[in-house]
Swiss-Prot record:
Pathway: Amino-acid biosynthesis; L-leucine biosynthesis; L-leucine from 3-methyl-2-oxobutanoate: step 2/4
Gene that this sequence comes from: leuD
Organism of provenance: Paracidovorax citrulli (strain AAC00-1)
Protein name: 3-isopropylmalate dehydratase small subunit
Function: Catalyzes the isomerization between 2-isopropylmalate and 3-isopropylmalate, via the formation of 2-isopropylmaleate.
PANTHER family xrefs: 3-ISOPROPYLMALATE DEHYDRATASE SMALL SUBUNIT, 3-ISOPROPYLMALATE DEHYDRATASE SMALL SUBUNIT 2-RELATED-RELATED
NCBIfam families: leuD, PRK01641.1
Amino acid sequence: MQKFTLHKGLVAPMDRENVDTDAIIPKQFLKSIKKTGFGPNLFDEWRYLDQPGQPGVPESARKPNPDFVLNQPRYAGASILLARKNFGCGSSREHAPWALDQYGFRAIIAPSFADIFFNNSFKNGLLPIVLPEATVSQLFDEVHAFPGYELTVDLERQVIVRAQGAEIPFEVNAFRKYCLLNGFDDIGLTLRQADKIRAFEAERLATKPWLAHTMPA
C-alpha cells in the first residue's frame, strides 16, 4: 500500500449529500476478479452520458457528461475530493475506495462518512478526513471562488494547510495513522510478524507432527 505522509493537491468539490457506493462504482463493474481497473468507471452514471455503462468499454469510446464536476477542465487532475455528509453510504463494497484511489484521489474531506466505507478507505491507502460541516461549507466556497484551489494534507501533523497558510486540524485514530504513514495494509501488518509466524508453525509441527499429514481422500 502506498504511504501517506504529506500530500498537496487540487481539490474537486462533490456538492451532494449521501453519495452511496453504487454511485461511486456501479454494481455492473464489480464482476472483475482483479483489484485494479476501476478508476475509469468512478462515478460512472454521473460521469458519462451513454448509460448504462458496461464493463470492457474503453474510456475513449464513452461520451463524457460535460456538466459533471470531474469532467470540468478546472478540476482535471484533482487528488483531493471535497464532499458532503454521509459520503460512502450504501453497500459495503470495497471497490468504492479502490475506484477513488485508482482515479487518483489520495484524500476525501467531508462532515461524515459511512462507517464501512470509512474503514475500507484506511485499509486501501485513502485518507478520509472528518471536519465540521461549517468548515466544509467554507472550503466549498473557496474551491468555487478560486480556480486551481489546492490544499496540503499533512498527516504526520494532522493538519490541512490552506493556500494562504492557515491550518485546519483534524483527528485520526493513532493506529490508522501509523498504518498510513508506513504504507501497511492488513497483509503488510501480518508480514511484519513473519518470523514469529514461522517459529510458531515450526514449533507446532515439531510437537504435533500429525497435523502435517493430509486426510485420505
